[in-house]
């Protein structure tokens, strides 16, 4: 088996292929900033690979149900991503359900039906400062994702 660099594509992850989150390598990407559109339930992270020739990329979260980020620099100064993982959402759902905010919330669908929490995924991004971003959303998108082709010999 051999690996060959393919092309760049937009990677879109939802609950059906959420396992891909654990296979995304964002190690050493520089975290440049965050944008939040509250009305659209949309968050975008601007990131940039260390190499100078790489243009900035972005990670976006759509249909955001929940997010939190620490900015304490627990491990000292730093703004590079260490890892991106699929996150267990159980504790956060428990907290929200105790407040009865999610259970009675309506989706943005035409019929205003109750939310289906099974359609949401949890994503956790660690920075080398020790800070962490947690997001629960329906869609996670990474533009300019490098695809590697596998060849059998």
Language-model features: where?
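Surface-exposed, interaction-prone regions used to assemble/regulate multi-protein complexes
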Residues: 2-153
């Amino acid at each position: 088996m051999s690996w060959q660099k393919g092309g760049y594509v937009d990677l879109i992850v939802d609950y059906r292929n959420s396992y891909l989150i654990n296979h995304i390598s964002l190690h050493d990407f520089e975290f440049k900033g965050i944008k939040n559109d509250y009305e659209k339930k949309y968050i975008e992270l601007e990131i940039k690979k260390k190499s100078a020739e790489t243009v900035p990329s972005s990670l976006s979260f759509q249909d955001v149900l929940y997010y939190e980020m620490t900015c304490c620099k627990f491990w000292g100064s730093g703004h590079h991503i260490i890892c991106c993982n699929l996150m267990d959402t159980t504790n956060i759902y428990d907290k929200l359900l105790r407040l009865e905010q999610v259970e009675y919330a309506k989706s943005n669908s035409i019929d205003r039906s109750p939310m289906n929490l099974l359609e949401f995924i949890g994503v956790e991004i660690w920075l080398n400062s020790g800070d962490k971003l947690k997001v629960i959303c329906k869609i996670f998108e990474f533009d300019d994702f490098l695809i590697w082709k596998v060849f059998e010999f």
